[in-house]
Amino acid sequence: MLILHKTTLKHKDMDFLSKVKENIDGLMNEKPFINDDFMLTNDYARELYHQSAEKMPIIDYHCHLVPKMIADNYQFKDLTEVWLGGDHYKWRAMRGNGVPEEFITGQRGSYEKFEKWAETVPYTMRNPLYHWTHLELARIFGVYDLLNPNTARAIYDECSAKLQTEEFRGQALMRRFDVRVVCTTDDPADTLEYHKQIKDNPFGTKVLPTWRPDKAMVVEKPEQYKEYIKKLAWAAGMEINSYQDLLDALRRRHDFFHEMGCRISDHGLENFYAEDFEMEEIDRIFRNALKGKKPSQEEVLKFRSAILLDFARMDHEKGWAQQFHIGAIRDNNTRMFDILGPDTGYDAIHDVPCAAAGHKFLNRLAMEDKLTKTILYNLNPKDNEVLATMAYTFNDGTCPGKIQLGSGWWFLDQEDGMKRQMTALSSLGLLSRFVGMLTDSRSFLSYPRHEYFRRILCNLLGEDLKNGKLPKSEMDFIHQMVKDISYNNAERYFNF
């Protein structure tokens, strides 16, 4: 080892060695990418997150977890199954990165698929997938290395090995993240047998159904619709031959869902439906569909308008909250839909105007005094302010945040989308009454998305405090506001 005495060095040499030492010290002390202060850019944000948001439990009031997998306390065989199976966010990114379909939904081996994902990850920088990927590795598996082709094998092996232990089964993951309530997405004809199994064998997280009756609206596909009505009739234990029969069957199932703990409905719609109609023509449209006759587009819209009102009336009778997810245009790639089916990454943002129909729909319910708690979600960011003002047109003082703008959804479930949603809600309503985040996910690994949202929320408020837009003297209230948005508001609002 060469030892140089300071007196033998020139000043420029000393400067050089000093800079080298600084660089070495910097590298040795460099925080991992996912660290305690990830996305928190000032002291106020850090205080709000670490003292308030970080400690709150989770209510995941809208997700697409499979109830059977929860009931069975499913154990995943490897990282590919738990991370890439059914995740159309990742599939879209892989396709965009030039990965052949055989490595995405095809028959290639598990590690081959994972390797292609690892090759894609560096190219997802500035896409939320980059943040989600590394948050999930850190929080779930304790892995702080960045995923790329050089680290793929080691990360795959380490995480897959951990998945073989009891601590990484589905129920254990939910307990680890202190998930108090999960609401799955369920059709009226579903038996809810796995919800009952979970209820009879509790593990610490309430797993409740959500009423999602979209299939009961699809009269434009009479052959499929007839089969669905048969399934619904069997579940309800009655014949369905008229529109009134349909409502009676749905009400029976609605009652059953309520008995099983359901307190939320959800509707995935291109737009609100609010056409004028007569009940005689709705019954005729329904009977014709059962005979295999395809309705006109005008008849489709009238039928949807009628049944959507009836769904909302049922929800009001039981005091449920109803959710409307507006603005998706689905299954746009016909060739790939024919191969892979729905929910495989071929949906997009629609641009249909929603203000007139939305106001007309909600006004009909308000005029009947049958407008229950309602959350409005838009997929097109142009509709943030539209739905925020729509919601506050129908609040009636009976419940804080009774009608409100929902969190950034699907393509807007990212930093910019969340900030724009919260800014619209803040500007045109009450952010403090917001029921907060949901995963909307099919994966047991998605709970760090609640952390992601909370960090964005705290940084948004922290920046306002730093810039003098919020009073520092009100820190106690702002801390409580963060706790409420993270958990308390949802607990009070949904009354699970």
Predicted regions mapped to residue ranges:
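Short, positively charged and aromatic/hydrophobic N-terminal segments
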Residues: 1-10, 19-22
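Short glycine/proline- and charge-enriched loop/turn segments
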Residues: 337-345
